[in-house]
Amino acid sequence: MTTGLAAAALAAALAVPAQAHGEGRPPHWELKETGTDVRFRGLAAVSRNSAWLAGSAGTVLRTGDGGRTWRNVSPPGAQDLQFRDIEAFDARRAVVLAIGEGEASRVYRTDDGGATWSESFRNTDPRAFYDCLTFFDTRRGLAMSDPVDGRFRILSTEDGGRSWNVLPNEGMPPALEGEAGFAASGQCLVASGPRDVWLA
């Protein structure tokens, strides 16, 4: 996805609530420049004004003014990582997932708008490749890896992404031959309600 298209998608997402609040204008597209040529794959809008973007070269951007300006709030030392999913709880708290084989799959969390980040998970299994994450609420979430030993691997957090544990895979159907997650935009694992998850 090009920078312009990601910015346009964000503008549309931010424009729809304006109509819902009675301003009376139909949804429209508005280009919001980010000031970078990074390829963005993750988007989390938490309000009309506040949103987060995550993409290549370990880049995380944040806006607090509806996309007029963007701040680079990337985790230090992450320039070789590919961020493909970001889940934000508000303007200060977010969790971002880097994809890749082995140690390239990582999770970071910020509690101060990206001023500082903590690495909360680094994959140590060379067979695992984490694709996406989702949250039920501000504490409970899951992350999904491509199959390991014939079944998708799932991580779980109970503290908002500050720590993660691999869940047992008993009861999970075997993956089909060649089946894997799609590591872009964070849509291969989606929470629905307080305990259900869709996996694709």
What do the PLM-derived regions correspond to, one by one?
Residues 4-13:
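Bacterial N-terminal signal peptides
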